[in-house]
């Protein structure tokens, strides 16, 4: 657990299990992308983004049909770049047509709006592609809230369990490690962020069945986070 007492002025947030229920990701987003994948590969084969992802798949799994490899990765919930890119394209179509709309935890948008109004800087770091992150926050049941964030970071900056990834985000944003709070439900990610000097807090959402660790502060809502770290709270 970090010992810094500097005031927090920047917050880096995970998505799944932190701002959005795990059930939405696994019961809505993932099945939608799996069902859409055959058509996406067939109908958009000439799309540069699809071609690039297919080339990456061939490099990672030579001789394996792209759809077979994608299904294998999805079965294992792998965080692989070309899979995330193609899932993002599938979700883009779903959000565009209105078939998808993200449901955030009810405490999220009010808390983030309070923090932004108070001058805090907010950014997202998720294994989902930057495009997918923007789609989620741009199409929520609370409306388009993507503008609350100044940055969206994905696996291109590095894996979420590597301290170097958090150092890279700090270098790109210019944020001070001791004044930056990272929120996630995954202990290994929090460990990496802490190694990079960030403050940390584990979100343990009761509806997700997250198991609390013993190395980081724990909160069940963003309001709990605010109280623990002296951030703006509801009146």
UniProtKB/Swiss-Prot annotation:
Keyword field: Amino-acid biosynthesis, Hydrolase, Magnesium, Metal-binding, Methionine biosynthesis
Pfam families attached to this UniProt entry: Hydrolase
Cofactor(s) this protein requires: Mg(2+)
Top-level taxonomic group: Bacteria
Gene Ontology molecular function, alphabetical: 2,3-diketo-5-methylthiopentyl-1-phosphate enolase activity; 2-hydroxy-3-keto-5-methylthiopentenyl-1-phosphate phosphatase activity; acireductone synthase activity; magnesium ion binding
Gene Ontology biological process terms, A to Z: L-methionine salvage from methylthioadenosine
Note on cofactor: Binds 1 Mg(2+) ion per subunit.
Reaction catalyzed: 5-methylsulfanyl-2,3-dioxopentyl phosphate + H2O = 1,2-dihydroxy-5-(methylsulfanyl)pent-1-en-3-one + phosphate
Pathway of action: Amino-acid biosynthesis; L-methionine biosynthesis via salvage pathway; L-methionine from S-methyl-5-thio-alpha-D-ribose 1-phosphate: step 3/6; Amino-acid biosynthesis; L-methionine biosynthesis via salvage pathway; L-methionine from S-methyl-5-thio-alpha-D-ribose 1-phosphate: step 4/6
EC number: 3.1.3.77
InterPro entries: Enolase-ppase_E1 (IPR023943), HAD-like_sf (IPR036412), HAD_sf (IPR023214)
Annotated family: Belongs to the HAD-like hydrolase superfamily. MasA/MtnC family.
Subunit structure: Monomer.
UniProt cross-references to NCBIfam families, sorted A to Z: enolase-ppase
Function: Bifunctional enzyme that catalyzes the enolization of 2,3-diketo-5-methylthiopentyl-1-phosphate (DK-MTP-1-P) into the intermediate 2-hydroxy-3-keto-5-methylthiopentenyl-1-phosphate (HK-MTPenyl-1-P), which is then dephosphorylated to form the acireductone 1,2-dihydroxy-3-keto-5-methylthiopentene (DHK-MTPene).
Official protein name in the record: Enolase-phosphatase E1
Species: Gluconacetobacter diazotrophicus (strain ATCC 49037 / DSM 5601 / CCUG 37298 / CIP 103539 / LMG 7603 / PAl5)
């Amino acid at each position: 657990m970090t010992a810094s007492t500097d005031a927090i002025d920047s917050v880096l947030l995970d998505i799944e299990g932190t701002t959005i229920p795990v059930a939405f990701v696994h019961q809505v987003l993932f099945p939608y992308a799996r069902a859409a994948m055959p058509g996406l590969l067939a109908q958009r084969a000439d799309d540069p983004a699809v071609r690039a992802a297919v080339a990456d798949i061939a490099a990672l799994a030579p001789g394996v049909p792209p759809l077979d490899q994608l299904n294998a990765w999805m079965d294992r919930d792998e965080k692989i770049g070309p899979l995330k890119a193609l899932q993002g394209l599938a979700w883009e179509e779903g959000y565009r047509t209105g078939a998808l709309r993200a449901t955030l935890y009810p405490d999220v948008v009010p808390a983030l709006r309070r923090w932004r109004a108070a001058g805090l800087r907010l950014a997202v770091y998720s294994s989902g592609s930057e495009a997918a992150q923007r789609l989620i926050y741009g199409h929520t049941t609370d409306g388009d809230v993507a503008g609350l964030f100044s940055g969206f970071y994905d696996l291109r900056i590095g894996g979420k369990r590597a301290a170097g990834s958090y150092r890279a985000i700090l270098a790109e944003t210019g944020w001070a490690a001791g004044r930056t709070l990272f929120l996630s439900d995954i202990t290994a990610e929090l460990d990496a962020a802490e190694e990079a000097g960030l403050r940390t807090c584990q979100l343990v959402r009761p509806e997700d069945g997250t198991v609390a660790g013993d190395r980081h502060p724990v909160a069940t809502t963003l309001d709990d986070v605010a109280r623990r770290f002296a951030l703006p709270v509801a009146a």
